[in-house]
Amino acid sequence: MIHHLKRTKIIATCGPALTKKLWTLAMLDDPAYAAMKAEAYANIENIIKNGVTVIRLNFSHGNHEEQAVRIKIVRDVAKKLNLPVSIMLDTNGPEIRVFETAPEGLKILKDSEVVINTTTKEVAKNNQFSVSDASGTYNMVNDVKVGQKILVDDGKLSLVVKRIDTKNNQVICVAQNDHTIFTKKRLNLPNADYSIPFLSAKDLRDIDFGLTHQIDYIAASFVNTTENIKQLRDYLASKNAKHVKLIAKIESNHALNNIDGIIKASDGIMVARGDLGLEIPYYKVPYWQRYMIKACRFFNKRVITATQMLDSLEKNIQPTRAEVTDVYFAVDRGNDATMLSGETANGAFPLNAVYVMKMIDKQSETFFDYQYNLNYYMANSKARHSEFWKQVVLPLAQKTAPKRKLINSDFKYDFVVHATNNLNEIYALSNARLAAAVIILTNDPQVYTGHGVDYGIFPYLIDQKPQSLSKAEFKSLANVAIKHYQQHGEISQLKQCLGVFHNKIISL
């Protein structure tokens, strides 16, 4: 057992694998579904205890009532455990999907001609299928060219455009391989300048639903420009929801051309490697993943690595060694959070997937180069000019960093406690990658649940305003919070702990 509270956060996508086939709120109160309800609650409790701090709801699938069921279960369990859990709404966004196929799908053979209907909506048959998008107004005919590739189902089917029939709104292609496609599978048009609207009416309805359920994050699909972020921020401002944090999903070459601006305009970045790896050459994805992690650290923003991290665990118990290495080095490079998608949404072993990711994350943290972090990231971070950084963050990083020759040794501190509602202070403590977990004492419910993505940050809800605490009150509450997270982190022997009181570092 590695005895420290895991500081890298885990985002788990919630779907039927976790909350079973509970589709309506009424089902939660129906005795006929009592066993299913008990299993769903037990699953969510298991993953939260194993380090999940964010539940992601993918609004490309399911309706509002299904998502309301999941939110209720998560909130009930989080309250029972007295742990903060963030809710992330992942927008449908400007994506193109197969409209509808028969249950057995549509089998496409290599070298066959395939017709894509871009405006009519018909069930797929005879090598023809229709496409749809959330806006309902998009016409793919306007975005493709003869000779261009169209990738379907995460690239499992490759089509090449043979001709374009603008009169009948059809794209005629030649299949490059055999594959069976199914309803709602994604289409990608590599290097296309998509004319599809960034925010559809469906996206806005989904966001409105999320706001009524007090979501903490919006993961915005296919952000390509800073204007996309501004559009979303303006909408949130109009709904009195500026506190909701925006995570820009980077999924296209267009976005990479504007990446620094997008990072600065957003609250964080999701390296969405699935679609990104279809929109750009796959061998460039690791470079851009590394670049985005470094840039987010520099600009004091959050960064999430996502997609196929433990993909084999959808069907298997053991991860591949390549997957283990992938997760390990995402943490080692400075990620805030690692994400599970299909593994927990639809996989056969969702609880195991979370446990595996937890153990890899914790192992990587023991080898994290805290001295390099001090000498490079902290010396160059945009946050370094603040007084709080100079008086508190840098001294804490220096004090808690373990001695290192080849590997880390001499971890002396388990926790740092700070009482604050100041987001800039919380972000600075997270970005510093301290060699100790940071407990934030807060009386603000939005601060309490709003930091599930932030590396090393563990809020604890108190009644008093942080700035009103006396030193004795601060120490008393800090020790209560430490005991709470010591138990959650399965830390049998507590090491030293530090506090930040009126910007001075004190022993606890």
UniProtKB/Swiss-Prot annotation:
Record keywords: Allosteric enzyme, ATP-binding, Glycolysis, Kinase, Magnesium, Metal-binding, Nucleotide-binding, Potassium, Pyruvate, Transferase
Pathway: Carbohydrate degradation; glycolysis; pyruvate from D-glyceraldehyde 3-phosphate: step 5/5
Keyword Nucleotidyltransferase appears in the UniProt entry: no
Binding site for K(+): N58, S60, D90, T91
Subunit structure: Homotetramer.
Family: Belongs to the pyruvate kinase family.
Protein name (Swiss-Prot/TrEMBL): Pyruvate kinase
